[in-house]
Amino acid sequence: MPPKRPQALEKLHVEPHDKGVSITDTMTLVVKGEGGVEMRVKQTGIAQGPGSSSAGGQPKSDAVMNKIKFEDLRIGSELGKGSQGKVRVAQHKLTGEKYAMKYIAFDGDSDDMRSALEAELRQVAAVKHHNVVSSYEAFFRDGRLYIVLEYMDCGTMNNLIDRHPEGFSEDMLAYIARELFKGLEFLHHLNMIHRDIKPANVLANTKGEIKISDFGVAKTLSGGDLQTLSAQGSVPYMSPERIQSKPYSFNSDIWSAGLTIAECAFREYPFASLKPKLFELCQAIASGTAKINWDDRETKFSDEFKEFIELCLRPEATRPSATEMLSHSLIQKASNVNPLEAGRWMSRKK
C-alpha cells in the first residue's frame, strides 16, 4: 500500500503533471524546472530524473548521491532561518561530523515554490565551489524537503559583527570581499543571479573560508536571456533597478555585495537611518539619493576602500562585474591575511 499523503501535500498534484511541483503515489517529490529538467527526491535521497545530471554532464551514481542517510543524522538546535525554510544543526551519529540541515515545508504548487525548490536542488546537484556552501544530499519526508548542507562553524557576517565590537581591519574586509566576489564570479559564470546577498547569507568557518549560502531565491538565466524581471530577495539590499521593477542582471548582486562589505566595515546597515522606514528607503535607493556619508564615520577608511564600495553602488549601466571588482587594488590587501589566522579571528568570542 502506498504511504499516506500528509495533509500539507493535498494541494500538490499526483503524477502525471505537466509542470511545477508534484509528488508520485510513492511519495517522491518531483520538481520540473525550466528547460524540462526534472529533479526527484525520495525519502532515501535524491534520485535521478529524466534529463538530470551533474555539472559535468554525467549522471551521478546512487553511491555518490546517497552517501548520507537521514537515519544517521541527529537533528539539534536551530541555527537560523533562510529565505524558504529553517536551518538546524545536525550531527552524524557515527562520525560526529556536523552539518546544517535546512528544511522546507510545502504550501502548494506556486511558481515561487517551484522556483525555490529548483534553485535549492540545483545547488545540491551542480553548484560546487570553494566560496559556495556545499550541499550534500536532500530527502523528502513527511511533507518536508530536507537539504543537508555544509556546517559553517563561525556563522554569518552578522555573527562576526556582533562578536567583534572593535571592528574589522581593512585587510580583513579585503579578504572577505575577495572570497565573496570569487563566489559571485563563479555563480555568474553559471548564469545564476543569487538575488539575496546580505550579511546573513555570507558565512565563515574556522578554516578562514568565506562562503555564499541560501539559494532559495536564486535565478538561473537560460535561453540566451541576460536579464530578468522577477522580484525576490531582501528589499534593503536590492539594487535601484530591482527596486524600480526594471530588468536586472548579474551586477545587481554586486550592489548587494557592496552593501554587505560596507555593513561589515560600519557594523551597521550603510543606510541605517532609513532602514526602519521601508518606503523612504526604497525611494532613496531607487532615486539614487541613498548615499554613504563617509565623513560621518568614526572609523576612517582608505580611499581604496571607499572607491571599492562606491563602484559597487554605481548605477546599473556602469556598475562593474564580479571579475572586474576582483581586479581592484583593494583586493590586493587580502594577501596580507593568512586564512588560518582569519579563522581564529572569526571564531573568537567577545
Swiss-Prot record:
SMART domains recorded: S_TKc (SM00220)
Gene Ontology MF terms in the entry: ATP binding; MAP kinase kinase activity; metal ion binding; protein kinase activity; protein serine kinase activity; protein tyrosine kinase activity
Catalytic activity: L-tyrosyl-[protein] + ATP = O-phospho-L-tyrosyl-[protein] + ADP + H(+); L-seryl-[protein] + ATP = O-phospho-L-seryl-[protein] + ADP + H(+); L-threonyl-[protein] + ATP = O-phospho-L-threonyl-[protein] + ADP + H(+)
An individual GO BP term: protein phosphorylation
Keywords for the protein's UniProt record, in alphabetical order: ATP-binding, Cell projection, Cilium, Cytoplasm, Flagellum, Kinase, Magnesium, Metal-binding, Nucleotide-binding, Nucleus, Transferase
Residues where ATP binds: L79, G80, K81, G82, S83, Q84, G85, K86, V87, K102
Compartment annotation: Cytoplasm, Cytosol; Cell projection, Cilium, Flagellum; Nucleus
CC cofactor: Mg(2+)
Disruption phenotype: Homozygous deletion mutants grow slightly slower, but have no significant morphological abnormalities. In BALB/c mice, has reduced infectivity, which is characterized by a delayed and decelerated development of footpad lesions.
Ranges of residues in domain Protein kinase: 73-331
Temperature profile: Active between 21 and 40 degrees Celsius.
InterPro entries according to UniProt: Kinase-like_dom_sf, Prot_kinase_dom
EC number(s) reported in the record: 2.7.12.2
Cofactor: how bound: Can use both Mg(2+) and Mn(2+) in vitro and shows higher activity with Mn(2+) but Mg(2+) is likely to be the in vivo cofactor.
PANTHER family reported in the protein's UniProt record: DUAL SPECIFICITY MITOGEN-ACTIVATED PROTEIN KINASE KINASE 5, DUAL SPECIFICITY MITOGEN-ACTIVATED PROTEIN KINASE KINASE 5-RELATED
Official protein name in the record: Putative mitogen-activated protein kinase kinase 4
Species in which this protein is naturally found: Leishmania mexicana
